[in-house]
Design a protein with these regions (language model features):
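C-terminal transmembrane-helix exit sites in multi-pass transporters
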Residues: 1-6, 31, 48-70, 190-209
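Juxtamembrane helix-entry segments on the extracytoplasmic side of multipass membrane proteins
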Residues: 9-12, 84-104, 138-156, 203-213
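Hydrophobic/small/kink-forming positions within alpha-helical transmembrane segments
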Residues: 19, 23, 27, 47-54, ...
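Transmembrane alpha-helical segments that form core, pore/gating elements
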Residues: 1, 52-54, 87-140, 168
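Specific transmembrane alpha-helical segments of multi-pass solute transporters/efflux pumps
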Residues: 4-45, 74, 81, 158-176
Length: 227
């Protein structure tokens, strides 16, 4: 895509910070779920990144209407119902890693709100992150069995879906408020659940429908009522 548009990856100081935050997200997310329940992990990831983005918005003196705070609370309640986290014993180290992931993703999103060239900036961030990750991959003791199919899916997921998805995210971020972006992220687990229903025939229970109403309602509230 960069070649077609005659662009090149951009490398700036912000690219290093963005890449480091991306690495924090990648490592924290990947290793946390080895010891942390899915529901708890989702709550920490999306809730934590929302806190980081809201705190950044306050620091940058972004005007936040009361309805947006109320909408966030309603959406978080919907997320809680959707993931239905159990309160079983989770590894404290795994929980800490997920907090690291939430901080990394929140910071990556905040930095993206000030980018003007989403595609080339994302490419630069990915290249720097790859340079950081490769040495870490050799340090971490882990035996991983791979095959050609898994290798292909990893390449496709990283270069196509993640690359284009993150570029789109960086394109959207400068056009909306940071707090609006943080709340909009809560649709991700909702979309994932619906995708499971469409593509792998997972069932949708009452929790999904209630969560959908709360999450979408919470996101819509500050759009229609801006006070």
């Amino acid at each position: 895509v960069l070649i077609v548009q005659k662009q090149i990856p951009r490398f700036k100081f912000n690219s290093i910070i963005s890449a480091l935050s991306l690495v924090c997200y990648l490592i924290g997310f990947s290793f946390s779920y080895l010891t942390v329940d899915t529901g708890i992990g989702a709550l920490i990831l999306f809730g934590g990144s929302m806190v980081v983005m809201f705190a950044s918005a306050l620091f940058l003196q972004e005007k936040i209407p009361l309805t947006r705070f109320i909408g966030v609370f309603i959406s978080l309640l919907g997320l809680f119902i959707l993931v239905n986290p159990g309160f079983s014993e989770n590894s404290l180290f795994g929980v800490a890693l997920m907090f690291l992931a939430s901080f990394g993703w929140g910071l990556y999103s905040v930095l993206g709100s000030r980018q003007k060239n989403p595609l080339s900036n994302t490419a630069g961030n990915f290249i720097i992150a790859l340079i950081i990750i490769i040495p870490i991959a050799f340090i971490i003791p882990d035996k991983v069995e791979t095959n050609y199919y898994g290798f292909f899916l990893a390449i496709f997921s990283g270069s196509v879906t993640s690359g284009l998805g993150y570029s789109l995210w960086y394109w959207v971020l400068p056009k909306i408020n940071i707090t609006t972006a943080s709340t909009a992220q809560l649709t991700v687990p909702l979309i994932a659940a619906f995708g499971g229903y469409l593509f792998i025939w997972e069932s949708l229970n009452w929790q999904f429908y209630i969560a959908a109403i709360l999450i979408l309602g919470g996101i819509s509230l500050p759009v229609f009522y801006k006070r």
